[in-house]
Amino acid sequence: MELNKNYKLNKQQSRALTLMCQDKNIFITAPAGAGKTLLINHYCDYVRQHEPFKKIAITSTTGVSAILIGGSTLHSYLGIGLGDGTIEDLVQRIKKASKGIKERVWKELTTLIIDEVSMLNPVLFDKLEKIARIIRGSDLPFGGIQLILSGDLLQLPVVKGGGTGNKNDHNMEFVTDANSWKKCIGNNIVLLTEIMRQKDFHFKEILLKIRVGNIDQQVRSVLSQHMKKEEKLKKEEIQPTRLFCLKKYVQDLNDSELKKLEDSGKKFINFNALIKKYSEEAVLTNKGRSRCTDLQFKFLSDRFVKDSTTPQHLRVCEGAQVMLTYNIDQLSGLVNGSRGVIIGFTEMKFPIVRFKNHKRNNLTPKLNKTNEDIKSDSTSQPQGFPEGNRRVMENPETKVSKTDDEEMNDTLELEVRPQTWEICNDFGKKIGYFKQIPLKIAYALTIHSCQGSTLDSAEVDLSDTFEHGQVYTALSRTRDLNSLVIKNLCFDSIKCHPRALQFYDDIKSMQDAISEIENSLSELDFDDDF
């Protein structure tokens, strides 16, 4: 099987990929940072190259994770709204949605990928399974659609209630409790155990203990140390992003920090996203594009904006702390989640951001642009947005170089230019685009919104933890312990659901047994003439 040559598969990943390529249903589960999404992305790349006839839906249970994997939310893609109502109600809703387009989506679908499936209500999973059989006229599990599911039952749990089930039914707490789960997935469950996000063995060990609720003396000692080192990180120009449990605190902190800048006399610049439907000519010259009505485009573009981590309206000034919402250069570490501070604006009013960057030399060949290069890039796009991705370039007045300041010797200054995201219909055809500066204000985020993301530095406020897995999800966002500050942690708030723990004990036992059988078979010396 051809894969990216830079991507090496371990045994667990190889088994998962084999099952996916055999059109088997599968649940890929793992601790945070173990590469669940990366594995699925490589599978999708393989299918696009070798089996383009397959109709694959890439979805997630949350808008943030949907954007991270380049897909749509499950609810919007399948046309089920909030998922409330009876099965009959939902079938009728699907048939009427977009003049029957959603029904056609269900009928033509080959493979349904659901990321963060661990946050899917089990009652809703059962509804979707029955709906698939009704619409497709098939008695096969999920109507014959291949399911590729990924998630972690020990991170953030299912959102209970919401019209999809009885929030007091303790026997239906996880998607794996769904009545149709066993017939859909069976024993095709692969547990990935190799952590890729954190390279520090000590940090990995601590996180894995927290994940399963093993709060021994080592964990208490290490976490206590990181509750006392706040002053050290405060000296940095780029402050750690604060993670809160509640949205209210996030909005309050972001607003108050911007207000301080405004009161100090900083001048703000507004960037409004350009959202545009492709013209008839643009559709005719590209097979990957499709026509749509203005009403359809309005619906799909509104959905995109709602799910996007990039704000439609961005208001920033010099001194504002921001976060990248797009991967500019993965080799250099300039990726979705990289944080920086705006230090000025170019003549064309694009922000110059000073990013923390430990792999600066990888970008050296790109640091050669001039003002003339910028102007030449700006001739072919509408409404003042220059063409192309954001560029890494020299500021005409400020050379890109390391400073003599010891605290700033790992930084890099970039001009951040608009990025284009293409808006697709439910068949994967491109119908228009969303163009915006790929930045967001990043003094604070919710723990929920950063599940699946990696942060270069974080200060985690755990004063309002209320869910199983919430502390583990928050603490596993950074790559190392030195990038983490912890506030208001009560060790009793580190909770793991006992049934989730039992699920993983069972899976590990099953996977160990499979490995033992495979090792035994590989040691047998078969006679070729047998």
Curated annotation (Swiss-Prot):
This is Uncharacterized protein 030L. GO terms for molecular function: ATP hydrolysis activity; DNA helicase activity. Residues 362-408 are annotated as: Disordered. It comes from Invertebrate iridescent virus 6. Belongs to the IIV-6 030L family. Residues 388-403 have a biased composition (Basic and acidic residues). It comes from the Viruses. InterPro entries: AAA+_ATPase (IPR003593), DNA_helicase_pif1-like_DEAD (IPR010285), P-loop_NTPase (IPR027417), Pif1-like_2B_dom (IPR049163), PIF1_helicase (IPR051055). GO terms for biological process: DNA repair; telomere maintenance. Gene3D superfamilies: P-loop containing nucleotide triphosphate hydrolases.
